[in-house]
Structures are given as structure tokens and as C-alpha cells.
Amino acid sequence: MDRRNFFKFSAVSALGATAVEAKALPDKQIASIIDIDLCDGCAKETMPLCVKACKIKNEPIFPVPKEPMMDYWPQTKHEDYSKQKDNISRLTPYNFTYIEKLEVDGKMLHIPRRCMHCDHPPCQKICPFGVISKSEEGAVDIDKNFCFGGAKCRDACPWGVPQRQAGVGIYLKVMPKLAGGGVMFKCDMCKDLLEQDKKPSCEVACPKNAIKFGKRDEIFAIANEMKKTRFIYGMDENGGTSTIYVSSVDFNKIDGAISKKYENKPKMGIMDMKKHPNPMEKSEFLAAATLVAPLAAIGAASIAVIKSVKDKK
């Protein structure tokens, strides 16, 4: 891409940055059901098998930070999980799924948590560099090669899913002291496996069949039948998602238990179960998205140039 096309691309993108969004194809869309009543957290295992399978699958993309790590200018801090790689109690750049253990009304619950893969992901809309995409199957993914780690995606996500690791990423080569802060990491629904018509690692590893992926219309039909006798979560939250939870316990009670468990404790990487509306419908987020649009256009154009140069080498 030459200089003229760069500016042309920027101008066109600026006009449509808030409206353009990658769409999953209806005939290829995948969704999942997580049956909380079936999950026992792999009580006899040293690590829940879905968590273990996820870590093994994604180990090749785990960050290897460069020392010393820069603080997030103008702040005097940075996020570093490189000494906590074995922490499976929450989402981190080295752990894309975890099991939330709760006791509600005398019943023990084990809830697999990871990215919900929203129908209209606010993280994608708010990203100032346009590096978050949605696959034909509906998987929401972050391009780790071009993410600056600004964490706007985490701010926009109702569940705070994406997690940041400092000391890695393109910002080290572009503006190590003035922009970014690393790379954001999260579950990508094993989109490479989905593209091959294979099942995600977490489903394959689950010994209780508590995790089930399938064609979206089929999964939603199952969920609609289940909600006649049980509670569901994820079908309407944040404007709709591709992850549906089913439980015999009311999700309002589950969310209350989560809030109580983490009261006065660090909540980074911990997902709640509130009935979230889509934050992009709120005026403050719409305003933020409008302000970010020109940046997204320039960022997307810049990344297109970098990719073009890289492809020519």
C-alpha cells in the first residue's frame, strides 16, 4: 500500500469505522452450551481438564515478555503475569478459561468461564487500531501481532475478559515509551479448529459433556427447550452471545455469590453473571466510539501498511 492509498484508506475508514463490523455467516455460525449442572470441576484431577486442554492448545501463543518492562505512560505501573503462569483461578494472558467454584443454596457449582463471543462485540467497536475481528463461525479474536495493548477492549467488555501482558507486542518496535502497553489475550474459540470442522479443545477434554459446541440454530433450539425447566444465561446478555449457560440455580443468585466471594478482593480476570445490556447502547460508550473512529481508521491504515510491507519481504 503506497502513501496515496494509505490516506485514501484512512479517509474511507474514518467515515465508516463506527458502522463497519465483520459479520459471522449464518450458515457457519457456531455457539456453545455450558451445562453447569453437569460440571464437577474435574474434582479428582489436579487441574480441570478443560483448563488444561486450553493451556496446552494455546501455549504456543503465550507471551514471552522482554525485560525491563515499560510502565504505561503516563502511569507508573504495568501488568505482568509472567510470574503467574500457573494461576488458573481467573483469566490471565496465560489462562483463557477458569472454573468458578461457588456454593449457592447449599449446592456446589463449578462454572467454566471464558470469552462469551458476543454477537455485537463492543470490544471490536471500541478498539482504536481495528485489530479485533469476528470470524465466519462467530469467534471474536484479537490479532496479537498488531495489538498495542491499550486495554480499551477490556474497558468496553461487560465481563472484562481480555487480559494484558506488558513487555510484548508491536508497540515495542513503534512507540515503546509513548503508546500501548503490551498485548491483550483471550479465548478465540479455537477458531482454527472450527475452520477445520473440529471441536474446540475444551469440549473434547470435558469428561462430563458439560460443554457442547454446534451450529448456532441447533444450540439455541436446545437452549430454548432447556429454559422451560431451568435458567439460562448468555442468550440476551450484551445484546446476545454465542455462549449459553444452563443451570437449575437462578443466575441472579449465582451472580450474588460471585459478588460476595470477591468482595474486597482483586477482581481483575473475574467474570460476573449480571444481566448486562450492550454497553455500546449507552451514551458514554457511543461517544467514546465516535471519538475513537478516526483513530481506528488511522490505526487500521497503519497496520495495513505494515502488513503490506511485511508481505513483500
Name the predicted role of every residue range.
Residues 1-313:
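Non-ligating segments of multi-cofactor redox enzymes
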